[in-house]
């Protein structure tokens, strides 16, 4: 069965219940959340996340598997500022606790950026950070995300991710989140040869580690190292390639999460595309009028 959903918001008093309600309104059967704002460390107590009501709503609507995304202020690749590294380690630990409390098994993490010290130094620091964070007892896996390679990001190649995984003691607690926009922007030819890319992933990392897919089109050509998401079928990856990935038999059990941009010129009146994009991917037919339909919410 196709597991498809999107990033949804966990906010207000309803928290996890609000996230599940939003996902159901899009016709989703999985979803991804940040446990608070992705750009800061302010978090509600676990007791205030409304977990029981959220889980009941999920069960009622057949949602069994959800994903958490770690905030992007965490940078355990930072070799230059010990405070940034220490904050990243401490905050990642608390996010894992929250992920466990919510009942999710995967927390997606941007591996980190070396901020000028070079990829080797950044990777060593990321390994150090993950070794401080991971415990044998935890039930959650950290899903290292494939990165586009913009700026000083580490994890732009399968080899870099494998290097991180190989260096970590409890690496059974590590998995991978494959982002279509990022891998395309990093230079992988997922448009014409996705099976070849998947074989390469299997050879270097192992398909058994692939636990989350981020399904995004890209505003930029392959190899641009930009990381700018586009709506499904309206970018340089295109509908056919993304549809092929979403329905790929080897990836059937993996949750596919859309992180495509809201639609509309007026920043105060942007519309979420997810209901329409999910329906289009289920139907496996590209709709050229999709963006208009999203704005009119037809």
UniProtKB/Swiss-Prot annotation:
Q: Which Gene3D superfamilies match?
A: Divalent-metal-dependent TIM barrel enzymes
Q: Which CDD domains match?
A: AP2Ec
Q: Which residues bind Zn(2+) 3?
A: 182, 227, 229
Which EC class, in a word? hydrolase
Q: Which cofactor does it need?
A: Zn(2+)
**Residues that coordinate or bind Zn(2+) 1:** 69, 110, 145
Query: Which reaction is the catalytic activity of this chain?
Result: Endonucleolytic cleavage to 5'-phosphooligonucleotide end-products
Query: What highest taxon heads this organism's lineage?
Result: Bacteria
Question: Sorted alphabetically, which keywords does the UniProt record give?
Answer: DNA damage, DNA repair, Endonuclease, Hydrolase, Metal-binding, Nuclease, Zinc
List positions binding Zn(2+) 2: 145, 179, 214, 259
What are the recorded Gene Ontology BP terms? base-excision repair
Q: Which SMART domains match?
A: AP2Ec
What molecular function does GO assign, one term?
deoxyribonuclease IV (phage-T4-induced) activity
How the cofactor binds, per note?
A: Binds 3 Zn(2+) ions.
**EC number of this enzyme:** 3.1.21.2
InterPro entries noted in UniProt: AP_endonuc_2, AP_endonuc_F2_Zn_BS, Xyl_isomerase-like_sf, Xyl_isomerase-like_TIM-brl
Q: What does this protein do?
A: Endonuclease IV plays a role in DNA repair. It cleaves phosphodiester bonds at apurinic or apyrimidinic (AP) sites, generating a 3'-hydroxyl group and a 5'-terminal sugar phosphate.
Q: Which family does it belong to?
A: Belongs to the AP endonuclease 2 family.
Classification via HAMAP family: Nfo (MF_00152)
Instruction: State the name under which the record lists this protein.
Output: Probable endonuclease 4
Protein source organism: Geobacillus sp. (strain WCH70)
Q: What is the lineage of its organism?
A: Bacteria, Bacillati, Bacillota, Bacilli, Bacillales
């Amino acid at each position: 069965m196709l597991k498809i959903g999107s990033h949804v918001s966990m906010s207000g008093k309803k928290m996890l219940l609000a996230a599940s309600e939003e996902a159901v309104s899009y016709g989703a059967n999985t979803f991804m959340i940040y446990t608070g704002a992705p750009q800061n460390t302010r978090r509600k107590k676990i007791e205030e996340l409304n977990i029981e009501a959220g889980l009941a709503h999920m069960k009622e609507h057949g949602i069994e598997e959800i994903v958490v995304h770690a905030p992007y202020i965490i940078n355990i690749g930072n070799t230059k500022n010990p405070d940034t590294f220490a904050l990243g380690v401490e905050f990642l630990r608390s996010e894992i606790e929250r992920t466990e409390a919510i009942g999710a098994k995967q927390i997606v993490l941007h591996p980190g950026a070396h901020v000028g010290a070079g990829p080797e130094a950044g990777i060593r620091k990321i390994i150090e950070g993950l070794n401080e964070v991971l415990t044998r007892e935890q039930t959650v896996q950290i899903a290292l995300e494939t990165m586009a390679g913009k700026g000083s990001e580490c994890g732009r190649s399968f080899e870099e991710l494998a290097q991180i995984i190989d260096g970590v003691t409890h690496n059974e607690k590590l998995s991978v989140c494959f982002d279509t926009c990022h891998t395309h922007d990093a230079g992988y030819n997922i448009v014409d040869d996705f099976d070849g890319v998947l074989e390469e992933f299997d050879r270097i990392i192992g398909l058994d580690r692939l636990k989350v897919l981020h399904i995004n089109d890209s505003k930029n050509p392959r190899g641009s190292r930009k990381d700018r998401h586009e709506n499904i079928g309206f970018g340089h990856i295109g509908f056919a390639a993304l549809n092929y990935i979403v329905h790929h038999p080897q990836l059937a059990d993996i949750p596919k999460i859309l992180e495509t941009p809201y639609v509309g010129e007026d920043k105060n009146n942007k519309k979420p595309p997810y209901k329409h994009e999910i329906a289009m991917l289920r139907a496996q037919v590209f709709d050229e009028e999709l963006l208009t339909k999203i704005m009119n919410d037809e």
